[in-house]
């Protein structure tokens, strides 16, 4: 059954999801978005679209209109789904981070998971936690490209079958906690310091990378932080970059080394709670 916190209506795409994935879905709390939340959305989108029109892959701007993403207001799931169904996809709201294997399985079923939260003003150019700007304005536009959406589905299909290790689960919980603390304005410096130390310790003691860890790395450096085209003059297509004006400007600087995307990328770890690249 869907999460009892909210009663949700499943559509033709999400009805095909395995029932054990329903527990991650929540009803988008649209009425809880404040005027400040809406202002944050408008500000980030206006800055991003104006900048990205010259440095992003062509499919980004085309996808903004195809998927019903407005610069003026936070999108509603119902509106997005009416448009996404035409390209065989759907969107669901989730509560922040979900486990990597669940994320991959949603993707394998052509379902885009969208965190219902929105970043605070403090993190307006970059957020350490998943939010609706990252998911809706970063991921959704690019999946309107047929070739890319099929790539994403296949990636999810393979990733959902990858084997995780106990260390992967520990890392997921540690990163989830750290991202929540960093985004919460009421968090103490001591709690953030302690959570950061926990993540750093785990990162240094992961041992041999599991299948899931390698898939997660591959996913991160393409779907989230991928560049495409000439390595000396690339275009942006990764959702993490498309939804972060700070990171999208940083990544194109000549001082940032651009690396070819190869199978070796599966060995390159990352810290989700820090701006990329770092």
PLM-predicted stretches and their roles:
Residues 1-191:
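The feature captures two recurrent sequence modes
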Residues 2-24, 239-278:
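C-terminal structured domains
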Residues 75, 172, 189-191, 226, ...:
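Glycine-rich, compositionally biased intrinsically disordered regions
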Residues 79-86, 153, 157, 213-228, ...:
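Short, hydrophobic/amphipathic alpha-helical patches that form generic packing surfaces
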Residues 88, 109-116, 128-143, 203, ...:
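Extended alpha-helical surfaces
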Residues 98-101, 235-239:
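Short linear loop/turn motifs
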Residues 168, 172-180, 184-229, 238:
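Extended, Lys/Arg-enriched charged tracts that mediate electrostatic binding to polyanionic substrates
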Residues 212, 230-231, 236, 250-251, ...:
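Extended, regular secondary-structure scaffolds
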